Amino acid sequence: LKEMIQSWRHVFKLDPDKEIDDETLDAVCLSGTDAIMVGGSTGVTYENTVNLLSRVRRYELPCVQEVSDLEAVVPGFDLYMVPMVLNTQDPTWIMGRHREGIERYGYMIPWDLVVTEGYIVLNENAAVAKLTGAETSIEASAAAAYAQIADKLMNLPIVYLEYSGVYGDMETVRTVRRSLDNARLFYGGGITSAQQASEAAAIADTIVVGNVVYDHLEQALETVKAVKD
C-alpha cells in the first residue's frame, strides 16, 4: 500500500472541519485525482473525520488521513500520513507528539499503513506555522538542507513543502526538488488555477490541492486536467 504514493501526481485535500455538499464531493472524487487526503490544522475531530471518510468511501479511490490530532485518528483509511515538522525548534512537532501517540496507542497502530512526511512549512501566516513555531523565513538552501535530512539521514518517503494558502516560490521548490534522491516531493499551497497546477507539477512529484475546492470548484477540477494532460 505504501508503494501507491509513488504514482500520485495530484491529490485533493479535504478538511473535515469544512462543509462540503454531496454534489461537490461527487465532482471531486470522480475528477480523476489520484487520492483524497483528509486532514486539517485545526478543528479536526474523530466525529467529523468519520463522517467525511464514510462519504469518500463510496468512491473507488485511495483515501488517506493526515494525522494532526491523536484523538481524531480513525480506523479504515488506506494510509496514515504522519507529519514531522523539520523547520521548527520545538521538538513537540518533530518527536514529542509522536512519542505521546506511540506510548498511548502503539499497540493499535497499523505500522504497515503509516507513512512519515518530512514537513517544511514556509508560510508564516498559516495556522500550521503558528501552531508549530515553524521558522518560515529560511532561504531555499536551508529548505533544501532540511529536505536532505529527511531524504538521506532519516530515509523518509515524503518531503512535503507546505505553503498552506499562498502560492509558493517555485525557485525554492525547484531547489528542494534537486536536492532529493529518493523521497517524493509533495507541494501544497495556494494552487487555484490550471496554470499554477501545471507549473507546480512540472517541478514537484505530487501536488496537493485544497482550499480552492471550497471556493471555486470548477477551477479546482481544472487542476486535475492540467496535471494529467
Residue ranges of predicted features:
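Conserved N-terminal beta1-alpha1 strand-loop-helix module at the mouth
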Residues: 1-61, 135-158
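Hydrophobic faces of well-ordered beta-strands that scaffold small-molecule active sites
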Residues: 8-14, 36-38, 63-65, 80-82, ...
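Alpha/beta catalytic cores of nucleotide-metabolism and tRNA/nucleoside-modifying enzymes
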Residues: 13, 17, 112-114, 119, ...
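Glycine-rich phosphate-binding active-site loops on the catalytic face of alpha/beta enzymes
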Residues: 38-43, 79-94, 163, 189-191, ...
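N-terminal active-site wall of soluble small-molecule enzyme domains
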Residues: 42-56, 64-77, 168-179
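C-terminal helical cap(s) of enzyme catalytic domains, especially alpha/beta-barrels
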Residues: 50-56, 95-98, 105, 212-229
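Catalytic cores of alpha/beta
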Residues: 65, 69-82, 176-209
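Conserved anion-binding
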Residues: 72-157
